[in-house]
Curated annotation (Swiss-Prot):
<dbReference type="Pfam" id="PF00225">
    <property type="entry name" value="Kinesin"/>
</dbReference>
<feature type="binding site">
    <location>
        <begin position="105"/>
        <end position="112"/>
    </location>
    <ligand>
        <name>ATP</name>
    </ligand>
</feature>
<dbReference type="GO" id="GO:0051301">
    <property type="term" value="P:cell division"/>
</dbReference>
<feature type="modified residue" description="Phosphothreonine; by CDK1">
    <location>
        <position position="937"/>
    </location>
</feature>
<comment type="subunit">
    <text>Heterotetramer of two heavy and two light chains. Interacts with aurka.</text>
</comment>
<feature type="modified residue" description="Phosphoserine; by NEK6">
    <location>
        <position position="1046"/>
    </location>
</feature>
<keyword id="KW-0131">Cell cycle</keyword>
<dbReference type="GO" id="GO:0090307">
    <property type="term" value="P:mitotic spindle assembly"/>
</dbReference>
<keyword id="KW-0493">Microtubule</keyword>
<feature type="coiled-coil region">
    <location>
        <begin position="365"/>
        <end position="480"/>
    </location>
</feature>
<keyword id="KW-0175">Coiled coil</keyword>
<keyword id="KW-0547">Nucleotide-binding</keyword>
<dbReference type="Pfam" id="PF13931">
    <property type="entry name" value="Microtub_bind"/>
</dbReference>
<keyword id="KW-0132">Cell division</keyword>
<dbReference type="InterPro" id="IPR001752">
    <property type="entry name" value="Kinesin_motor_dom"/>
</dbReference>
<dbReference type="GO" id="GO:0008017">
    <property type="term" value="F:microtubule binding"/>
</dbReference>
<dbReference type="InterPro" id="IPR047241">
    <property type="entry name" value="KIF11-like_kin_motor_dom"/>
</dbReference>
């Protein structure tokens, strides 16, 4: 039981795993920049947060923050999204999981670009280097790379499904009919899966075929241009990748592992008002929004754990049923826009993605199939389809009652379940042994690796200690050099302070001088420039004004004189023109009167001609009607009589057909005899089939015996392998061997039962074959009787056709009589038409006569009207001439008044120009600036500053001095320690101090270097030289107390840190 539980746990890992949700924000596009839209989205990739400003620009409180599994900002690249989202999923697909990745978001936010991308101009890019490639081409490229590196046999098949207006279409179908709709059915092997009938799966052999497949699908996919996106996807697409991989177990058995990856590119949700969709585009948008709303309801129901999930309300949710709450690992990429004009859609997308995080899936690894089982399954399926096809073609087969068929199917299903159960148990045990062996090998390998790493680390530690010793020596030398450099730096710092003080004083004086010069220069330049520019501009302006005023006055005077002369001339010319106009009008009316009289007489002549032509047309029409009647009679004789003859010929032809029917009946009788012989031969073949099936079942019995022997052999080999391979796990293996023994015994018992069931099946097959022979004989007798009935019916049909022919002859005679009647009726019609035409012609002649009288009366009216019009025009022209003379006289008076007014304006303008010149002179004389002394100009003086700089000694000299000081210090320390140890020390003076044990071997190289680094600031002398001087002074004094010696020992002890490493000196 423990092995079975471990197998089930390894098969169903990652129970209750949440859907992974990723948010990607695209950059601003040109449409959003033209609309002056600002950003309302802040993406924090390290913290995996997205912040949305729902208020105004200055509203700091109106923010909403969402947390997701991953967040990609506008600067994120295609490869970053792929490596973070799809690479881990791809490894799980190769392990045998079903995985789904789909992109959701508003239209125009980059879903298709994320899933498919674009193809770069240089086709030599790999999937990692191509900057524009999307998830689909990168996925297939990496699948081929990974599987090729593993060295396993594999096959990759892809399919591309489109959901457009709630209809399914295959974008990779080889048929030219793009509009062929597909049907969807529930998968009986997977309760949450579906099967698409007729969906084409294309085999992909290398990564170079990926772009060709995508181009085929993109060429058929429905796209259109809207106001929000130039290439808006109008449908959902599902790109499925199925991988079959072959594995070889320890026993040499070949297994087939299946992994599936669904890459879904959803159509974007859109606002019809903003996208400008109408008619067909509006219906598409409605269907898209409807399917996305259903998807949202499904997600809400899954999060709230509702009892009913509305998967079947949309074909999109029905296809994604296993990806939402099923056994598939799912990732959602939500694409959003950062622009403020898309704030509502962005918030809706983020809310949708935030709800989808809480969906729980239960991923399961697809069951591995053995190669033999898979081939056997395919072979049985092919044979079954062949038998069904042959039966359908020949309309032949084995027929059973429903009870026997259901009983047989129940037995087969129960036996298949028993065999499947024991096969799974054996597979679980084999996998458990394989896992234990792999674990042992991995632990052994890890132990060897750890041993190797430990040896390497020990070598590295020795090298590090050696490098540490050298580094400490170099550090001590550098510290001594730095001390000397600090001393020199302090001296240089004092010199620099003095120089900076002098520089500040000189800079202050120079600034004062420059300020003085700038003030002088500014005043001079300002006055000169203002004076010159203002004087020049004002002189030019006043000269131009004065000249223009003079010219304007002269011109106005000339214009007034010209107006006066022109008006006088206009009055004379107008009077003459009016007189001429009156005379011309009178002449024109006279000519009009003559013309009208002439035209009326001409019209009378035309009417007379029309009467003559009408009479002639009447005669011609009567002749035409007579010719029509003659032609119609001739057509009836020449055309219809042959038709009647043809009908009679058809009657004779039908008689010949009846004779043919009689011959067919004779042939059917011969066919009946042939069928008798066929059914006899068929009965013999069924008998042979029964004998062949008996021999086949006997061979199955022998194969079962051999299989039984092989199972017993495998059992003995398994026991020996378990005893020899693992000794440390003896107790567990004993339990495993007992369980295996019990399972094998049960398997042998079931095999015995299977043998009995095969015997029963053989007996059933014999009985079924006998029934089939009897059934075939009964069908033979039935078919012979039916053939005889058919022959009798054909003879009866021939007799009925003879009656039909006689009736058709009678109808032909009736047709001849009706044709003669039609001829008489057409003659009568021609006579009546001739009478109607005569009456119409007479009416036309009467109408022309009345028109003649009307034109004569019109001529008289025109003559009277023209005379009256001439009188009126003459009176009107005279009145017009008097009005113009009066208006021109008043105009001359007005022009004289304007001339006097212009003279007055000229005098006023001269006065204004004179006053302007006076103002300019006062400005130039009174308003110019002068330079005023400020008293801040510096006086001349001398500056004192240092002229020499201190320089540090060379590095070689400093290092030599350091070595000498170190040597002297070590000698002084040795002497001090020796003097402190030689004389006896009183116990009372050392009670308060800890015991000191000094040994050269206990000192570390660090302590030595630290002693050599401590120096005083006065001249760079180290403190150990001062101790040496104290030691010499102590030696010269004879009465040195024990307290002073103890103080020296304390100083030495404090300056020497304790260490367990030996002291190494290299001078």
């Amino acid at each position: 039981m423990s092995s079975q539980n471990s197998f089930m746990s390894s098969k169903k890992d990652d129970k209750g795993k949440n859907i992974q949700v990723v948010v990607r924000c695209r950059p601003f596009n040109q449409l959003e920049r033209k609309a002056s839209s600002h950003s309302v989205l802040e993406c924090d990739a390290p913290r995996k947060e997205v912040c949305v400003r729902t208020g105004g620009i200055n509203d700091k409180l109106g923010k909403k923050t969402y947390t997701f599994d991953m967040v990609f900002g506008p600067a994120a690249k295609q490869i970053d999204v792929y490596r973070s989202v799809v690479c881990p999923i791809l490894d799980e697909v190769i392990m045998g999981y079903n995985c789904t990745v789909f992109a959701y978001g508003q239209t125009g936010t980059g879903k298709t670009f994320t899933m498919e991308g674009e193809r770069s101009a240089d086709e030599e890019f790999t999937w990692e280097q191509d900057p524009l490639a999307g998830i689909i081409p990168r996925t297939l490229h990496q699948i081929f790379e990974k599987l090729s590196e593993n060295g396993t046999e594999f096959s990759v098949k892809v399919s591309l499904l489109e959901i457009y207006n709630e209809e399914l279409f295959d974008l990779l179908s080889p048929s030219p009919d793009v509009g062929e709709r597909l049907q969807m059915f529930d998968d009986p092997r997977n309760k949450r899966g579906v099967i698409i009938k007729g969906l084409e799966e294309v085999s992909v052999h290398n990564k170079d075929e990926v772009y060709h497949i995508l181009e085929r699908g993109a060429a058929r996919r429905k796209t259109a241009s809207t106001l929000m996106n130039a290439y808006s996807s109008r449908s959902h697409s599902v790109f499925s990748v199925t991988i079959h991989m072959k594995e070889t177990t320890v026993d040499g058995e070949e297994l087939v592992k299946i992994g599936k990856l669904n890459l879904v590119d959803l159509a974007g949700s859109e606002n019809i008002g903003r996208s400008g969709a109408v008619d067909k585009r509006a219906r598409e948008a409605g269907n898209i929004n409807q399917s996305l709303l259903t998807l949202g309801r499904v997600i809400t129901a899954l999060v709230e754990r509702a009892p009913h999930i509305p998967y079947r309300e949309s074909k999109l949710t029905r296809i994604l049923q296993d990806s939402l709450g099923g056994r598939t690992k799912t990732s959602i990429i939500a694409t959003v826009s950062p622009a403020s004009i898309n704030l509502e859609e962005t918030v809706s997308t983020l809310e949708y993605a935030n709800r989808a995080k809480n969906i729980m899936n239960k991923p399961e690894v697809n069951q591995k199939l053995t190669k033999r089982a898979l081939i056997k399954e395919y072979t049985e399926e092919i044979e079954r389809l062949k038998r069904d096809l042959a039966t359908a073609r020949e309309k032949n087969g084995v027929y059973l009652s429903n009870e026997n068929y259901e009983q047989l199917q129940g037995k087969v299903l129960s036996q298949e379940e028993i065999i499947t159960e024991y096969t799974e148990k054996i597979t679980a045990m084999e996998e458990e042994i394989k896992r234990i062996n792999e674990l042992f090998a991995e632990n052994k390998k890890e132990l060897e690796e750890c041993t190797t790493i430990l040896q390497c680390k020990e070598k590295e530690l020795e090298e590090t200690q050696k490098n540490l010793h050298e580094s400490k020596e170099q550090l001590a030398q550098e510290a001594f050099v730095v001390t000397a450099l600090e001393t020199t730096e302090k001296k240089l710092h004092g010199t620099a302070n003095k120089l900076l003080t002098t520089v500040r004083e000189t800079s202050k004086d120079v600034s004062g001088l420059h300020a003085k010069l700038d003030r002088k220069r500014a005043v001079d330049q300002h006055n000169t420039q203002v004076h010159e520019n203002f004087a020049e501009q004002m002189d030019k302006r006043f000269s131009v004004i004065e000249r223009s005023v003079d010219e304007y006055s002269v011109k106005q005077q000339g214009m007034l004189d010209f107006y006066t002369n022109s008006i006088d001339n206009l009055l004379g010319a107008s009077s003459a023109a009016l007189s001429v106009t009156a005379t011309a009008v009178a002449k024109s009316f006279t000519s009009v009167q003559e013309t009208v009289s002439e035209k009326v007489s001409h019209s009378v002549d035309e009417i007379l001609k029309q009467e003559t032509l009408s009479s002639q047309a009447k005669d011609d029409l009567q002749k035409l009607m007579a010719a029509h009647r003659t032609g119609l009679e001739q057509a009836l004789r020449t055309d219809l009589l042959p038709v009647v003859t043809a009908v009679l010929n058809l009657n004779s032809h039908l008689s010949h057909c009846l004779q043919n029917f009689q011959a067919v009946a004779d042939k059917i009788d011969s066919h009946k005899e042939e069928m008798n012989s066929f059914f006899t031969e068929h009965s013999r073949s069924l008998h042979r089939l029964r004998l062949d099936s008996g021999s086949a079942l006997s061979s199955i019995q022998s194969e079962y015996e051999s299989l039984k022997v092989e199972i017993e052999t495998a059992q003995s080999m398994h026991s020996e392998g378990v005893n020899n391979l693992i000794g440390s796990l003896q107790n567990q293996l004993n339990l495993l061997a007992m369980e295996t023994q019990q399972n094998f015994s049960g398997f042998l018992a079931k095999g015995g039962k299977l043998q009995k069931s095969v015997g029963c099946l053989q007996q059933d097959l014999d009985s079924i074959s006998s029934d089939a022979i009897e059934h075939t004989s009964s069908h033979h007798d039935k078919f012979a009787g039916q053939s005889q009935d058919i022959a009798v019916e054909i003879r009866q049909l021939a007799a009925s056709n003879m009656g039909t022919l006689e009736e058709s002859s009678k109808q032909c005679e009736k047709l001849t009589g009706s044709i003669n009647a039609i001829s008489r009726e057409s003659q009568h019609w021609c006579e009546s038409a001739s009478q109607q035409i005569d009456s119409l012609l007479e009416e036309q002649v009467c109408y022309l006569r009345t028109s003649k009288k009307h034109l004569q009366s019109l001529q008289k009216d025109v003559e009277v009207g023209c005379g009256a019009s001439v009188v009126e025009i003459t009176e009107h022209v005279n009145a017009q001439r008097q009005a113009e003379e009066k208006a021109l006289t008043s105009l001359v008076e007005q022009v004289r008044d304007d001339k006097e007014m212009l003279g007055e304006q000229r005098l006023e303008l001269h006065e204004q120009v004179q006053s302007g010149q006076n103002k300019v002179n006062s400005y130039l004389n009174e308003e110019l600036r002068n330079d005023v002394p400020t008293g801040t100009t510096p006086q001349r003086r001398d500056y004192v500053y240092p002229s020499l700089l201190v320089r540090t000694k060379p590095r070689d000299v400093l290092l030599e001095q350091f070595r000498q000081q170190q040597q002297e210090y070590l000698e002084s320390i040795s002497s001090v320690i020796s003097e402190a140890v030689e004389p006896p020390v009183e116990q009372d003076s050392l009670e308060d101090e800890p015991p000191v044990a000094v040994n050269d071997s206990v000192m570390s190289e660090k302590s030595c270097i630290d002693l050599s680094m401590v120096c005083q600031e006065n001249g760079g002398v180290p403190f150990f030289q001062q101790k040496k001087a104290l030691r010499k002074e102590k030696e010269n004094r004879a009465n040195t107390t024990l307290l002073e010696r103890s103080k020296i020992m304390d100083e030495a002890e404090q300056s020497l840190p304790k260490s367990k490493l030996p002291l190494r000196m290299q001078n």
